[in-house]
């Protein structure tokens, strides 16, 4: 089984906060102010050290320390802004939900939580730090989902159009790994600023065409969302990638460099890093039902979980039926009246904890109570089926592809807006001050 993305991210993120060995450390200082929050110099230094260590392990070259520092600061700024937003709306990942996530990760890794803790600590990492980094990762995922999802509308006409296109042309059976560099422009730029950005973009393009390493160039020059990852986006089908990418790469081949392409954000350079056939043309769908209880000032976390445990006993003993309890108690208005039925769907459309739980169940099996950002659930997996993503392309699949494309686009818009509205001040290190 592939390593869990949660585990990989958390192990990577934990390394950021690991102190170097016993050399004396200078007194820490405030490096960045972000609204009423701060970033410490030690946080920047530790993240730079981690990026360098990962680059050495991957035999990857990096740009200058100053360019790398700029990208690290930008990543920390965006992270802090999202966490501040989560705090403002009262989004907090409690210990019970965190424990559930850790149990799911351990299950994916085919080990117990104790074994996973031992593995993490054997690599010199603190399990407590792992928990807090994972809590932050879950928070970021949830605040993005909450804030971005409500900005997205997928119209019936868009779905019908994509279904028709797929039926006429067939599902594009190629996935592309895209490299992206954005040379940004200021808000409301004048002609001189546009010209300056255009010249920078063309200079970057010439360096790339002369053989300069793309990842190193992206870290040094890009203002795009994946800059610190060398500008590399994961494999995407053309129907789910951002519109800007999809419009220019159709028919392109591995190694092609395209651009600069002008948009409202600036000038884009795109490279086809790799292209491959779709890994599978079949998708797995599940039919499930659930009961949701939402903790509140009246219903505590422990009480909600205990009620679901009691429901579970009643269902297993035959004293009550799942659908009857769902109609009576579930607080999911979309499914309660249908006995908790969620219908056929890909597990990936649900929040991660729900999807992970469904993936761990056998048909007819009912889960133990588990926590998501929506509240406490029990769910029953009723059936699984595989459908052909090319021959049986349906409206649900079309909606998912359009939604993913729009989510990537709106996520960046949301981050840009938050950054533009924030008070941000970067304080230069003493050694850089004139």
From Swiss-Prot:
Superkingdom of origin: Bacteria
Functional summary from the UniProt entry: Chaperone involved in the correct folding and assembly of outer membrane proteins. Recognizes specific patterns of aromatic residues and the orientation of their side chains, which are found more frequently in integral outer membrane proteins. May act in both early periplasmic and late outer membrane-associated steps of protein maturation.
Occurrences of domain PpiC (ranges): 173-274, 283-383
Domain notes per entry: The PPIase activity resides only in the second parvulin domain. The N-terminal region and the C-terminal tail are necessary and sufficient for the chaperone activity of SurA. The PPIase activity is dispensable for SurA to function as a chaperone. The N-terminal region and the C-terminal tail are also required for porin recognition.
Gene Ontology MF term list: peptide binding; peptidyl-prolyl cis-trans isomerase activity; unfolded protein binding
Record-given protein name: Chaperone SurA
Magnesium among keywords: no
Keyword Membrane included in the entry's annotation: no
Keywords: Chaperone, Isomerase, Periplasm, Repeat, Rotamase, Signal
UniProt-listed GO biological process terms: Gram-negative-bacterium-type cell outer membrane assembly; protein folding; protein stabilization
Signal sequence bounds: 1-22
GO cellular component, one term: outer membrane-bounded periplasmic space
InterPro entries: OMP_Chaperone_SurA, PPIase_dom_sf, PPIase_PpiC, PPIase_PpiC_CS, PPIase_SurA, SurA_N, Trigger_fact/SurA_dom_sf
Chemical reaction(s) catalysed: [protein]-peptidylproline (omega=180) = [protein]-peptidylproline (omega=0)
Subcellular location field: Periplasm
UniProt-listed Pfam families: Rotamase, SurA_N
EC number, as in UniProt: 5.2.1.8
């Amino acid at each position: 089984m592939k390593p869990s993305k949660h585990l990989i991210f958390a192990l990577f993120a934990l390394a950021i906060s690991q102190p170097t060995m016993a050399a004396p450390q200078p007194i820490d200082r405030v490096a960045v102010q972000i609204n009423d929050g701060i970033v410490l110099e030690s946080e920047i230094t530790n993240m730079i050290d981690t990026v360098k260590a990962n680059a050495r392990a991957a035999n990857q070259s990096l740009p200058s320390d100053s360019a790398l520092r700029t990208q690290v600061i930008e990543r920390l700024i965006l992270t802090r802004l999202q966490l501040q937003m989560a705090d403002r709306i009262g989004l907090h990942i409690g210990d019970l939900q965190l424990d559930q996530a850790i149990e799911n990760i351990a299950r994916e890794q085919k080990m117990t939580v104790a074994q996973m803790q031992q593995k993490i600590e054997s690599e010199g990492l603190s399990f407590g730090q792992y928990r807090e980094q994972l809590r932050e990762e879950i928070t970021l995922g949830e605040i993005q989902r909450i804030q971005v999802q409500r900005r997205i509308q997928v119209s019936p006409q868009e779905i019908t159009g994509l279904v028709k296109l797929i039926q006429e042309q067939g599902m594009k059976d190629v996935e592309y790994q895209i490299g992206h560099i954005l040379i940004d422009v200021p808000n409301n730029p004048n002609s001189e600023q546009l010209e300056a950005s255009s010249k920078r973009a063309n200079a970057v393009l010439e360096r790339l065409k002369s053989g300069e390493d793309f990842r190193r160039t992206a870290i040094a020059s890009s203002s795009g969302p994946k800059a610190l990852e060398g500008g590399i986006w994961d494999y995407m089908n053309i129907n789910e990638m951002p519109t800007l990418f999809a419009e220019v790469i159709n028919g392109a081949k591995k190694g092609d460099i395209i651009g600069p392409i002008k948009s409202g954000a600036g000038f884009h350079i795109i490279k086809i890093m790799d292209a491959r056939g779709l890994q599978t043309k079949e998708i797995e769908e599940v039919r499930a039902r659930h009961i949701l209880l939402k903790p509140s000032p009246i219903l505590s976390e422990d009480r909600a979980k205990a009620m679901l445990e009691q429901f579970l006993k009643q269902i297993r003993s035959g004293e009550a039926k799942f659908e009857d309890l769902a109609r009576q108690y579930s607080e999911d208005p979309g499914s309660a009246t249908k006995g908790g039925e969620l219908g056929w769907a890909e597990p990936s459309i649900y929040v991660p904890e729900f999807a992970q739980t469904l993936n761990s169940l056998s048909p007819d099996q009912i889960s133990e109570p588990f926590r998501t950002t929506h509240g406490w659930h029990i769910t029953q997996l009723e059936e699984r089926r595989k459908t052909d993503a090319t021959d049986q392309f349906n409206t649900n699949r079309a909606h998912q592809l359009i939604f993913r494309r729009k989510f990537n686009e709106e996520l960046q818009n949301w981050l840009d807006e938050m950054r533009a509205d924030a008070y941000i001040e970067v304080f230069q290190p003493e050694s850089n001050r004139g």
